[in-house]
Amino acid sequence: METFSSKDLALQAQKKILSRMASKSMVNMFIDETSSEILDELYRVSKEYTKNKTESQKVIKNLIKIAVKIGVLFRHNRFSPEELVLAKDFKNRLHNGAMTAISFYEVEFTFEKDVLPEILMECKNLVLRLVEKHLTPKSHGRIQHVFNHFADPEMLSQLYDTKSSLRPHLQKICNGLNKLIEEEKL
């Protein structure tokens, strides 16, 4: 017997459309102002560190696509109770990671090169488990790309170096993270 669901078809179409719309102009529809500012700073950090504008744009575009797709899945109640536990674990781990990133910034000489990459890899694994049954292998690749990019220990070391040209971006990122935490969005 053929299983057809217009709801599933509509969700699939919506995800497809959203995957094509993840550009900076569309971010404002799905991501709040503070998050958008953080994404802009992450782009600048990536571009300055890699010296590769195209790669930096791609990693931010992939991050936006994944965030939007997960948001669509969540809004359409597509996650099982077990997957919702994974989502909560991810949110908690991301919150702890943000607190750690802020602490490393605010308290000089506390940055440990391996801590943030480890947290980001844990977050990546949770997201991959969360979307395993919902998104395509191409989307899984995007998740890998984003987390692997920002978990680069050398990039993070430069970001936290008090004499680095990346440091002003870190201040803006941490200010944004603090705001999201205060507003209980992260």
From Swiss-Prot:
One Pfam family linked to the record: DUF758
Gene3D superfamilies per the UniProt record, alphabetical: Tumor necrosis factor alpha-induced protein 8-like (1.20.1440.160)
A cellular-component GO term for this protein: cytoplasm
Record-linked InterPro entries: TNFAIP8-like, TNFAIP8_sf
Highest taxon in the source lineage: Eukaryota
Keyword RNA-binding (UniProt): no
Biological processes, Gene Ontology terms: innate immune response; negative regulation of inflammatory response; negative regulation of T cell activation; regulation of apoptotic process
Domain notes: The central region was initially thought to constitute a DED (death effector) domain. However, 3D-structure data reveal a previously uncharacterized fold that is different from the predicted fold of a DED (death effector) domain. It consists of a large, hydrophobic central cavity that is poised for cofactor binding.
Role: Acts as a negative regulator of innate and adaptive immunity by maintaining immune homeostasis. Negative regulator of Toll-like receptor and T-cell receptor function. Prevents hyperresponsiveness of the immune system and maintains immune homeostasis. Inhibits jun/ap1 and NF-kappa-B activation. Promotes Fas-induced apoptosis.
UniProt similarity note: Belongs to the TNFAIP8 family. TNFAIP8L2 subfamily.
Identification of the protein by name: Tumor necrosis factor alpha-induced protein 8-like protein 2
Species: Xenopus laevis (African clawed frog)
Gene that this polypeptide is encoded by: tnfaip8l2
